[in-house]
Amino acid sequence: SACLVGSGDVYKRQVSNPPYFVDSLKCPDQKRNTARHTDTLTLEDLLQDSRKLLAPQGRIALILPYDQKERLTDCIRTQNLYLSKETSVIPVPGAEPKRLLAELTAEPPVFPTFSSQLTIEIARHQYTDEYVSLTKDFYLKM
């Protein structure tokens, strides 16, 4: 995103599945490491550049590991962004959330943050109706 900053372009919608492994085991494949680890693109850097490229009423959508929620909250505050929606993604009922879907805005939201929960499976390969509804266009056997 650094190459776009300063171009004068702004975007109404930004969607990112950023690198999010921090200080974790790496593999021999450098390209894979670059895509998956925060060595070359931290969440702070991503949000700083995204904020600069965000239209006044635009939105940034992210998926992160759930354990990065506090870090995201700190970054949002630093970049003068606002959390408008958050979804905790849970693999199976009773499990801890594994992912966080977050939507950020540059302007304070009119309503409080909308929080929801998405459970993926009821049991192994028995997907919830909500998950099927959201993903059926992307899978052949859903």
Question: Which residue stretches match the model-derived regions?
Answer:
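Alpha-helix initiation/capping motif
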Residues: 35-39, 93, 124
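Flexible, active-site-adjacent loop/turn segments at secondary-structure boundaries
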Residues: 2, 19, 32, 112, ...
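Conserved Class I SAM-dependent methyltransferase catalytic core
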Residues: 40-97, 101-102
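Mobile active-site "lid"/loop adjacent to the S-adenosyl-L-methionine
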Residues: 12-13, 18-45, 49
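Phosphate/oxyanion-binding loops and surfaces in catalytic or ligand/nucleic-acid-binding neighborhoods
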Residues: 21, 79, 107
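SAM/dcSAM-binding transferase cores
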Residues: 96-142
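Single conserved hydrophobic/aromatic residue that forms the stacking wall/gate
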Residues: 1-11
